[in-house]
From Swiss-Prot:
Subunit structure: Bindings to phosphatidylinositol 3-kinase and SHP2.
Species per Swiss-Prot/TrEMBL record: Drosophila erecta (Fruit fly)
Regions of compositional bias (Low complexity) in chain numbering: 936-948
Protein name stated in the entry: Insulin receptor substrate 1
GO annotation, biological process: cellular response to starvation; determination of adult lifespan; germ-line stem-cell niche homeostasis; glucose homeostasis; growth of a germarium-derived egg chamber; insulin receptor signaling pathway; insulin-like growth factor receptor signaling pathway; lipid homeostasis
PH domain ranges (all copies): 8-109
Name of the coding gene: chico
Coiled coil, from the record: none
Length: 948
């Protein structure tokens, strides 16, 4: 090997040529005063020593690129690219490669420093032949070219002469930005590689087709260029530097381009990582000052902030350096490419990669994208102004004068009642002056029109803080205020009323019209008139459409519970039946409490009887002609309908009134005609209500029992007995009718009240009789006819009291059915056999006063009284209302004429379940009364009591 000191030889040795893979003796010379730096090779070392001519001399000043090649089968290859073509050498090891490559790059830089020439460090250089296809012939790019790749562009350098054999001009060198390349690909069998250019490229849109040495080179070109296109590019850096007179920044470390949105349409590069590493190695060899690693870019939106450790390899530039741009600089104006003043300290900008995202937001390095320091818009501390500015403005000025200045932004949740209306007006005026500096104009919104007609601070008239409204909500609220009005126009300061739920602001509930919620001192002066649906105060009427207190749309105040009506049902829907004309007659009857009700309402009018008990009554006009009476029932129950069964509800009727009054007259005035017995008073005249005081005299009853004809001769009547005594029935009834006619006018009022009481029911303690009549055979008891004429009294004979166990008793207060009352007058003419019972007729109280007849009968066995039941108690337990569970019997109590002052008899005769064998004929002219206990079926057997 020749000495370096001879002629500037630096390195020498046996190396292989890339094309032929033959060993040659290569000698590298430095630049001297006599010659320039060059690379020579000989066939053998012997020829070199003999000073033979070298096979080829490659001057380093003609090489625009010296780099390592990675796309060949050999691992250690160095390529020297020049306008004459590329020359490649193959080394034995990595150390030999690094030694030769470093020396070549040093010599190249020395030449560049001496001549002032800047060499572009290309990452990859391929020698291709551009075919006459696509736009190549039109633009003059045909023949052999070097395809040189950098991180930002793809450069084609002409090899050979500048003209074609046909005399056409060839482009010596052209640079195409990677951002203007739409796509690239290769055809493996034909060793073809192509690129599709966009309209922003310097050549225009079109395709470039080029042929490589082999298919491996085409594949490597495709993968490498595609990887560079996917990385961050610095395509417009050179143009920016030209405008700003700054040197090229291509020697600075680069950052790979991020993936675009249409990354799925691009072929997958399987050798990206390996090629990137090789590119960095080649770059570091060709440019020793570029040993910094490029920063990779994520493929998705950032999901977290980076740490300081992640940004250790990042390099930031001060104000003296321009930053890269991610847009095409071919036609961009200078104003859009301003310089960035980003800080020099490391900021965490690296983001995590994500495969799911198809869109990548690239960071702009221009000055317009940054402030002096970068702002992390993903920070949780960053304010997002999503709220309406009206809300902030109204909340800022909604403060109370009593609060401190430190609580300006606090909205009080308690009622605020101004003590003076003038003070309130001044307060609103001050707030308007403060709001004058804040004007928010919404030209296309409907709230502008309302500002001319309405007061926007009208919500503060009730002393409340100013409500913060969003855009559009004030319109509906002002209409609602106009509809409701304000009660404070009358000089009052009403409190806030309960809040409406969503959707209920369109109407005013009836319960709110009937319930005026005002200050505790003034609430007693108001009266609600349900029939007119208005609110009255000292004679002044405020109808529904007039001004009343404004409803609040906020939450109700819990502190105003004492001002609200105590009626717990006031918030429910009320059904007012007070205007119904067909219910006026029974309006005074309420919840089956007529005895107590009449005592409280009717004036007390004592009867001229021998008893100390009185009957409370009123005039016939007040009771039956529909005069409205003042009741003492709780006012809360006034507007509700009693939910009783409709079929059993009683309605007063006057159809059967004359006949019933006749019977009352007969009963009341039979005793004065006789001298033997006093007359009882009628305190409570009811079919099922017997005064308990009349049953206390048990000793007197025992004395009457000994003289009763029932104890002497119990008898049984046959059907023929009733028929044979029809003439006696005529005479008896004629006498009784004459007596009743004479006393008609005197007892009209008392009879009406007695009829009214008969239609109503008292307490449960006085409603029931003592026994159930369930015998299987008839027991017929009669009295002698001379006993009836002897005392001149109305005798009663119980033919039968039939109890049908198949019928279930309803509640006792529901037995007065309107249907039965209408038919009761027709049943008075039915025929039946009756027997006298003086002991029972002495003091019984019944619904109808019925006279009986004296019938002839045969005497029966004296052993009959063993079937008689003694009446011991009148207070029976309440019966079940069920129609299925327990069959119950019907009971009857008889109001007998007042022939005696003693208690009623204790013995009644059992009847049979059977119907009477033969009934008396109604054509005899006698008057009969029938008590029918059947409420469900008129055809069923019933208990019948008849008057003879």
């Amino acid at each position: 090997m020749a000495s370096i000191s001879d002629d500037g030889m630096a390195l020498s040795g046996y190396l292989k040529k890339l094309k032929t893979m033959k060993k040659k003796f290569f000698v590298l010379y430095e630049e001297t005063s006599n010659s320039s730096a060059r690379l020579e090779y000989y066939d053998t070392e012997k020829k070199f020593l003999q000073r033979a001519e070298p096979k080829r001399v490659i001057y380093l000043k003609n090489c625009f690129n010296i780099n390592r090649r990675l796309d060949t089968k050999q691992r250690f290859v160095i390529v020297l690219s020049s306008r004459d073509g590329g020359f490649g050498i193959v080394l034995e090891s990595e150390n030999d490669l690094r030694k030769w490559l470093d020396k070549l790059l040093v010599l190249q830089r020395n030449i560049a420093n001496t001549n002032g020439t800047a060499y572009s460090p290309y990452d990859q250089v391929w020698q291709v032949v551009i075919q006459k296809k696509g736009i190549s012939e039109k633009v003059g790019i045909t023949g052999t070219y070097h395809c040189c790749l950098t991180s930002k562009s793809l450069t084609f350098v002409c090899i050979g002469p500048d003209k074609t054999p046909n005399g056409e001009e060839r482009v010596a060198s052209i640079e195409i930005l990677l951002t203007t390349i739409r796509r690239c690909g290769h055809a493996s069998p034909q060793c073809i590689f192509y690129v599709e250019l966009g309209r922003q490229s310097v050549l225009g849109s079109g395709d470039l087709w080029m042929e490589t040495d082999n298919a491996a080179v085409a594949t490597n070109m495709h993968n490498t260029i595609l990887s560079a296109m996917s990385a961050k590019t610095e395509s417009n850096t050179n143009l920016i530097n030209v405008y700003q007179n700054r040197p090229d920044l291509s020697h600075e470390p680069m950052r790979k381009r991020s993936s675009s949105a249409n990354e799925a349409s691009k072929p997958i590069n399987v050798n990206v990582i390996q090629n990137s590493q090789n590119s960095l190695d080649l770059r570091s060899c060709s440019s020793p000052h570029n040993y910094g690693f490029g920063r990779e870019r994520c493929d998705s939106l950032p999901t977290r902030n980076g740490t300081l450790s992640e940004s250790s390899n990042q390099t930031y530039f001060g104000s003296n350096h321009g930053l890269r741009s991610n847009t095409i600089s071919g036609i961009r104006p200078h104003s859009s490419n301003k310089h960035s003043n980003s800080p020099t300290f490391t900021m965490p900008l690296r983001c995590s990669a994500s495969e799911e995202s198809s869109i990548s937001i690239e960071e702009s390095d221009d000055n317009g994208s940054f402030s002096h320091y970068r702002l992390n818009t993903r920070s949780s501390e960053t304010a997002i102004p999503e709220e309406n500015i009206d809300d902030f403005a109204s909340a800022e000025f909604s403060k109370v004068s009593e609060q401190n200045e430190s609580d300006e932004n606090y909205i009080p949740m308690t009622p605020i009642n101004p003590t003076d209306a003038i003070h309130e007006k001044e307060k609103v005026d001050m707030q308007r002056l403060e709001d004058g500096s804040l004007h928010f104009d919404f030209p296309e919104h409907a709230s502008e029109k309302l500002a001319r007609d309405f007061d926007l601070d009208s919500d503060n008239q009730c002393g409340r803080p100013i409500r913060a409204y969003s855009i559009g909500n004030k319109v509906e609220h002002l209409k609602f205020n106009k509809r409701l009005g304000h009660l404070n126009d009358t000089g009052q300061n009403p409190n806030r009323v309960r809040a409406y739920s969503v959707g209920s602001k369109s109407k005013i509930p009836r319960c709110d019209l009937q319930r005026v919620v005002l200050v505790e001192d003034n609430k007693h002066e108001f009266a609600a008139n349900r029939s007119q649906s208005s609110i009255t105060k000292e004679g002044t009427s405020y109808s529904t459409s007039s001004n009343r207190q404004k409803k609040s749309t906020s939450a109700p105040l819990l502190s105003l519970k004492n001002h609200i009506n105590s009626d717990r049902m006031s918030d429910l829907m009320e059904i007012d039946f007070s205007q119904a004309t067909n219910l006026e007659k029974q309006k005074f009857i309420k919840n089956n409490e007529i005895p107590k009700y009449i005592e409280n309402v009717f004036p007390k009018t004592p009867r001229t009887d021998s008893s100390s008990l009185t009957l409370h009554a009123t005039s016939q006009k007040d009771i039956f002609n529909g005069t409205k009476l003042n009741n003492t029932v709780n006012a809360s129950e006034e507007g509700y309908l009693e939910m009783k069964p409709v079929g059993n509800a009683y309605t007063p009727s006057s159809n059967c009134l004359p006949i019933k009054v006749e019977k009352l007259k007969i009963s009341d005035y039979t005793a004065p005609l006789t001298t033997a017995a006093p007359v009882h008073d009628l305190n409570k005249i009811s079919a099922y209500n017997i005064s308990a005081e009349k049953w206390k005299e048990q000793s007197l009853c025992e004395e009457k029992k000994s003289n009763s004809p029932l104890n002497e001769t119990p008898c049984s009547l046959k059907p023929t007995d009733v028929e044979s005594n029809s003439h006696d029935e005529h005479s008896t009834n004629n006498m009784e009718c004459e007596v009743s006619v004479q006393c008609d006018k005197q007892n009209n009022l008392d009879d009406k009240v007695a009829e009214n009481n008969n239609l109503d029911i008292g307490g449960h303690e006085e409603k029931k009789l003592v026994h159930s009549i369930s015998s299987e055979d008839y027991t017929q008891i009669k009295d002698k006819s001379n006993d009836f004429t002897k005392f001149n009294e109305a005798g009663y004979k119980i033919l039968q009291i039939k109890s049908d166990s198949s019928l279930i008793s309803l509640k006792l207060y529901q037995k007065g059915i309107h249907k039965d009352n209408l038919e009761r007058s027709h049943r008075l003419t039915e025929s039946v056999n009756t027997i006298p019972d003086n002991a029972t007729a002495s003091s019984s109280v019944t619904k109808f006063n019925i006279n009986t007849k004296a019938a002839d009968s045969r005497s029966t066995d004296p052993s009959t009284p063993q079937n008689i039941l003694q009446i011991k108690d009148l207070n029976f337990p309440s019966r079940s209302s069920s129609r299925i569970s327990q069959p119950e019997l019907h009971y009857a109590s008889l109001d007998l004429p007042h022939c005696s002052g003693q208690n009623p008899a204790k013995y009644l005769k059992r009847g049979s379940r059977e119907s009477p064998p033969v009934s008396a004929c109604p054509g005899d002219g006698n008057t009969y009364a029938k008590i029918d206990f059947d409420q469900s079926d008129s055809s069923s057997s019933s208990s019948n009591i008849f008057n003879t």
